[in-house]
Amino acid sequence: MRRYLALAAVMVMAMTACSRAESTSPIRSLGASFDPRSITFTAILTPFDACDAVLAHFKAEALERVGPYGLDGGPRWYFFEGGARAQEDTAGPPGDGSVTTMAAGLPTGGEDGGFSGTNVQVSGVDEPDIIKTDGERILSIVDGKLRYVDVTGDEPVLLGELQLETGWNHRFFVDGDRAFVFSQGDLDAIPMFAADSRIAPPYGMTVSVVQEVDLSDPDDMQVVRTLRVDGSYLSARSIDGVVRMVVSSYPSNLPFVYPSNESAEDIALAANRQIIEASTLETWVPSYTLYDADGDEVTSGLVVACDRMHRPAEFAGFDTLSVTTLDLSGSLGAGNGTGVIARGETVYASHTSLYVATNVWIPENVSDTPDFQEFSERYETAVHKFDIAGDGPATYRASGSIDGHLLNQFSLDEFDGDLRIAVTEGAPWSFEEDSESKIVVLTERDGVLVEIGSVGNMGKGERIYSVRFLGETAYVVTFRQVDPLYVVDLSDPESPVVSGELKIPGYSSYLHPLGDGLLLGVGQAADSQGRTTGAKATLFDVSDPSDPRELSSWTIADAYSDVEWEHLAFLYWAPADIVVLPIQSWMTQFMGAVVLKTDDGLREYGRITHQREDRPGDGSDCEVLDSVKEAGLVIQLCDEGDDGGYGGYYCEPLPADEAAALARDWGVEVSDDQLDAADRVEVCWPNYELGDPQIMRSLVIGDTLWTLSWHGLQANALDGLEVLHKVEF
């Protein structure tokens, strides 16, 4: 806890320096920020030789940039002609990539093939998720509770549940009778702050939390150790029981003061410089604390040892990106960390390398009133490479950057030692007419990721919606009005080429190999103007790279699937030729999963819902206009004695003209003879709190399909989808 005591001392010093000279807002901690124009992305990073050098580096850079409002006081905004505006940077979701070949498809089964595994990007590189199985038990985390369900008998049995630490985004790995749960929390959960309400945690500071859970007694699962690391948890990967956890940290415990008027700025600047001068190593470098089962501190220290910290030759910000190594086969410890002074957002790992990428805006020499194109052109992607071969600590290897922004984890892939990156030029929200997408191939040379090949001119005026790298081939989907699927030949990394292209309406935001030259896309259908109309799954024949074809498709109007942004929600079970997609429709109120068959094209095999026992049934004693109900909205005419209301819907009485206008907004025309000004009219729309719970994941054990929702687990027969069992949470 030394870090927080030092923080309190610095705050007292700052208050003493400024209390008589100026009026300030309440002293509070803000995330350190700075003028992004001063950032230079230098590819070669060098390690520090001592802790004094680390502290001196941070102090010198901060003293050069601190002002009366702290370190630049926040992001810089620009206003463009036409009213568009943009923030300084945009984060992409964390994730991974794939080196699977099309011929094999993507394995998702357990070691014996009798159950499905997590839908990972790289076979053998596990990813944490909210559900895991070994074929005999199903472990899941829903609403912060870890549940253990035994599925070895005739009936599934919920043996135990454990309330986890307050936080969010709980995901876990399992190794034998132990689970390692990763989550994002805040400092309220740390004993020092929880025990004394007078001590407020630093404003905006978050912690990454790892909890080791003993599963040996399912009736009495216990958290035996907890590791807390300063910063935001990005992602983790596990290879042969060795976990690499990636965290991005920033110095958010600098209690800068702020002047109440212009005349006090000099005094505030002096106070803020004093705060930086008084800062310690723990102020800048993230710390960890390890607790035992009773919440007592076991050990604490810096996440990254000083000689394992790396910095660029020129200023690159105050963030620390750390990769911590944990061993699943032993008790949870502090781990061995490696770090670079840089930001991190998107994580990808092969069996031997881990990459962390960041979308960054570099606004050097931007005019005071830039146009949109000038702003968009300044987006870059910075990438840092770490060696994770073996079970030792990760080793920093190289860095590099390219123009443009990447979409997510699938934009990165390592093959034969080279890194392939798919990016779109410009800002993530931009649809510039001359923008294009490209694939760039980087290789490591003397600590630098250098470009050795590229292919562009994909999707003019569009941006990437999905990418899948499969061996020497990449599949790229761009979209604005139509969905071009590009097939890219990467067999020659120095001279990649686009070998084929297919244009169809809509887009795929997730691509999955099915083997035998088949590729499945999940996304949205769209009309000729690019307006999305509902969820869509498309089966592509890509056996001829020069002539990709759409074999068949399946759609559901006014709906979406979590698979569009969460690949872990996807299930492909090759032994039964099925794909399972969670589906939510905002018009028909369908909440469940759709099972598609892939053995002869693409066809719907059935639907699964976790039907609630207390769900109100459809129906009303009023006259329902069926034509409106089909669009997801119910408009009904009620007599004076009618109770009104519609089961499972929220109803509100409206004047006839307003009801008709609302119906038109939903795409339904109501004729004059259907509504009269004197009528009592009720407008009803789906109340999802009363509907079926959303299905989040699915898995297969033997001949049973299991699905997970907030409400519990449900077992359906693979053959026919008959409901077999339910385990309610």
Enumerate the language-model features and the residues they cover.
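Beta-sheet-rich non-transmembrane sensory/scaffold domains
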Residues: 18-729
